[in-house]
Amino acid sequence: RDKARRLAGQTAVVARRLGLEDGYRVFMHGGLLLNAPRYAEAFRQCLDMYSEAQFMTCALTGHAAVAAWAETLDRVPEWASEWRGDAPGTRHPELPPTERRADSGPFLDALDAAGIVDLMIRREADTCAAVAACASEIARVVGLAGRVLEGGGRIFYIGAGTSGRLGVLDASECPPTFGVSPDRVIGIIAGGDTALRNSLEGEEDRPEHGGRDLAAHSAGPGDLVVGIAASGATPYVAGALEHARAAGAPTVLVCCVPRPAIAADTVIALDTGPEVLAGSTRLRAGTATKMVLNMISTGGMTLAGYVC
């Protein structure tokens, strides 16, 4: 009920800011509002506390709704940057592997509990192979991490979303594991500590914030900066690595696409392929990424003499 009340409050705020009078229409759409009667009823009751609204169902949804709406327009909307119809045969850029749907296998929502577990286990089976294919690049970074730590330098992990959380996780595990101070391996996430628990949309799209957050720690030639971006294109990470290069720090990119847009001294491109839930890189991509971070921190600490 708390989440339904929160959604109702947000709906009421939007209606007020749009200047809508009582009796405005609220179209019920989405998994919870359509398939969870108790949630939908709680939402209606909570919204009624703020204002009077008409609750409607959608005659059309998704692409069909957008197409039908577009046909009613007689001019290009001011906010539209491009308005065109593609000719037959037009080719569009391919989605990155992590965003595609697997070529074979059942849809996740068609399976029962045992089927979901079996499918996810089978899909994760290739994760180790994806990491093994990058063994030489990982070993190079482990050696560099060892030299940096032995010389008194620091390792920085920087990323957004799941990638940022994995970096912060690995960094936070180093003090209790190796007996080092928290400033030897530092995790930085777009949006700060709040983003560890709550999604902050838009922060990952600001390269200047990546540079700013890294600059706050005065990273320099004696440090190692590891950018983490499953897509290989996160602007926040690109900005951080650009700042690191300008400061003279060696840079590493850990990604899950074959041709990342971000440049780094060493690129670890993990071929994890499509996720069982398309686009959800907290799954296979996240598993492979954490394996690499484990190797960098554990291997680096070992070479620097913290394991005996």
Listing of model-derived features with the role each one plays in the protein:
Residues 1-2, 110-111, 118:
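A mobile "lid/hinge" subdomain adjacent to the ATP/sugar-phosphate binding pocket shared
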Residues 1-86:
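ATP-binding/phosphotransfer module of carbohydrate and carboxylate kinases, centering on a glycine-rich
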Residues 9, 133-148:
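A short, well-structured juxtamembrane/interface segment
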Residues 20-22, 151-152, 219-222:
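Short helix-loop-beta connector
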Residues 80-108:
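N-terminal amphipathic/basic leader segments beginning at the initiator methionine
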Residues 124-129:
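Short glycine/proline- and acidic residue-enriched helix-loop micro-motifs
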Residues 155-292, 298-307:
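Glycine-rich phosphate-binding loops that contact phosphosugars or nucleotide phosphates
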